[in-house]
Regions:
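HIT superfamily nucleotide-processing domains
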Residues: 1-95
Length: 95
């Protein structure tokens, strides 16, 4: 389900959620990984993620925003995207 759209990005619920709130924020243009995108693109994705977090009521308790990059970073989809996770306490280290 789409939860937010801009001219440059789309945010939708993850099909295999790892938290009560798990939203992917994806640029409309293709970038294989974070290293391939500009500061403006990455900043916009994080900004959209924070807007979704507010929409989902996560501001008071907190949330996590993460982008997996490369094999060791756990990237399995080679199109830049950020994960917004919230609705439960996050652990560190994550994995």
């Amino acid at each position: 389900r789409i939860v937010r759209e801009t001219n440059d990005a789309i945010a939708f619920e993850d099909i295999a959620p790892q938290a009560p709130v798990h939203v992917l924020v994806v640029p409309r243009s293709h970038f294989p990984a974070a290293r391939d995108a500009s500061e403006q693109v990455i900043g916009h994705l994080v900004h959209v993620a924070t807007q979704v977090a507010t929409d989902k009521g996560l501001d008071n308790r907190g949330y996590r925003i993460v982008a997996n990059t490369g094999d060791d970073g756990g990237q399995t989809v080679h199109h830049l995207h950020v994960h917004l996770l919230g609705g439960r306490a996050m652990k560190w280290p994550p994995g």
